[in-house]
Amino acid sequence: MSASAHSRGAEDSGLSAGPSATHRGRGPTARRPTRAPDSGSTDSGGDSGGDADSIETQFWEEWPVETKGSDVNDEAIQFEYTAVEGEGVPEVDTHFAQAETPWMREFALEVQQSLNDLGVPVNLINVQPSTRYGEFWRADVGHPMPITMNLHGPDPQRGLDPNPFLMRAHPETGGNYYNYKNDEVTELLDEQAQTIGDTEARAEICGEVAQLLNEDAYLIAANFPEVITVANTADWEGYIPTPGNGTTRDSFIWTQVNLQPQGDSTTWVKGVTSGIQGTNLPFSSGGQEEKRLLNVYDGLFDASPQLEIVPALATNADVVDDTTVEMDLREGVEWHDGEPFTPQDVKFSVEYYQENDAPQQAAFVRPIDSVEIVSESGGGRVRFNLTEPDASFLTQRVVRSAIIPEHRWSDIDSPAQYNPDNPVGTGPFSFVSWEQGSQIRMEKHENNWMWDDDIRRELVGEEYFVAGDGIDEIVWANVGNVSTLIGAMQSGDIDAIGTTVSNAQADRAANTSGVEKQTARNYVPTDVHLSHLVPLFRDKTFRVALSHAFDKEGFVENTLGGRGEAIEGQNLLTPILTPYHAETEPYEYDPETAQEMLQQAGYTFDGDDNLVWPEGDAWDAFAERVENGHASRQDLDQPDFS
């Protein structure tokens, strides 16, 4: 086949049913296919002279959230994509954000090539990261397009617990952007989420979920790219290559609390490509705004450079029973304005977030029914009463927490519109100034425990710890694009690049004396989201074929220069996440096999190698697969139509 006929610019195969295919029976019946008037094709029964059947993009059954489901299709469906019996498969709009990584355009072209090899035309649409999360990553209705791709951000909780990725396949979570619903998977997800105190049992359930999702080829899990950053090592010592974050990005604070100046300057300047939009962390839109402000605020617990749970405002946690957790709080902590931190601040923060729907703290407070102050002696002790058992409460949720001072927030009636001139926290850095679009400046908060050498050594580990007084100030300078950042590094205007760069870009920057390329492992994947509302991607046979058409190893070797790990199977959980990572069977790269699978399922190719929808009896088989959503041709004992 020739793929070139299907390509559009980035600007504007009965051999295998996939790994471990098993028959799980038919799912709920969907809305029956509708007629496409005046199509000129034969109807579904194979008789000539009638209109062709068609299947529209739609929710295929009821959902447990009011904004999704077959009963709200007219309001919830944000785009059109229709399968018409015997006609050519239409062009697929495919969204990506070129500015997200130095190689995202090349990744988008790889996705395009995979679909082209299956005869599917692709329209690549480049969007800005700053706009796509509000417009195209919608928690209420999911992605409003057939395909989108993404390199996930290295939020600490994603390296601590399986839920941030696995629960995206649950129909009740806002992170289910691809609108995937599989009752067997949902039941197992609920079971693991409530398995408290038995890590081995929970890991076994998570392994079952990973196997089912991989077998269902529910998305394309492509790679774990190495995190490549650039920093000035002549004037600064103590960079920490935290997995996912690398040495200089903003999801973890370890580098900036461990750095020791080796020259005259005690102000560390990090060059970045974008500024922040406000100073209100709990009610922000997330992204860089949230991450940079986490230097101002502390949570109850933190994630270490070894991705272990370590104390922060709370020094320990006791599980009283499945729905009760008590924590001792750190003694002697002060807010940046000199007021003492108390257990009442923790209780207030939780209740305030719940009353005012703080989006960036929803993951933390969601399972909490109430907070009680058990004791005020020492640092104090608080009790969390949960609504139900929650296995992730003491991993991802407490690490996501950010505690705010009651004396600063209690009189704020409209917190979502609040933009404090001087945000006050207990974190290792206090806020100094913000010049919108230009820079943020913070200074060391001496009272924070991070500046105690003994405590910091225990938190970061002997391998990375460097003794000393640390930096006095940190500045985020909004320099521009990566090329401008490299120039600023080479001229000495900045001390680090606060975003990832390509291997070639890092090598170019490191040609300057005192500048070093630094790498770290990654626990967040690059993936391709397929909308399960679209009839093409509701067909499991097509999803499996696409899995065979994507060259994961080739992309890592040819585009990433070998600096990354191709993912085996469609499994978003990294091997770093022990014991929850489960081995999943890979889909061998074989476009010819993928094409033959489609032909056996009733698809055909026209004279220009474009994919054509099935017709006649093959259309009926296709409609059955689409209605089911989780069964291939072999699963349903359908004949070979090739």
Q: Which residues does each PLM region occupy?
A:
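Aromatic- and charge-enriched surface segment that lines or borders ligand/interaction sites
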Residues: 316-359, 383, 536
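Periplasmic binding protein-like
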Residues: 113-170, 270-271, 338, 489
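A local structural motif
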Residues: 88-93, 113-128, 325, 384, ...
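Surface-exposed binding/hinge segments that line
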Residues: 318, 363-411, 423-435
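Short, solvent-exposed loop/beta-turn-alpha elements that line the ligand-binding surface or hinge
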Residues: 49-91, 134-143, 163-191, 224-269, ...
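Extracellular/periplasmic solute-recognition and catalytic clefts
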Residues: 150-154, 374, 432-443, 475-534, ...
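Alpha-helical secondary-structure segments
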Residues: 52, 89-101, 196-216, 269, ...
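N-terminal export signals
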Residues: 1-33
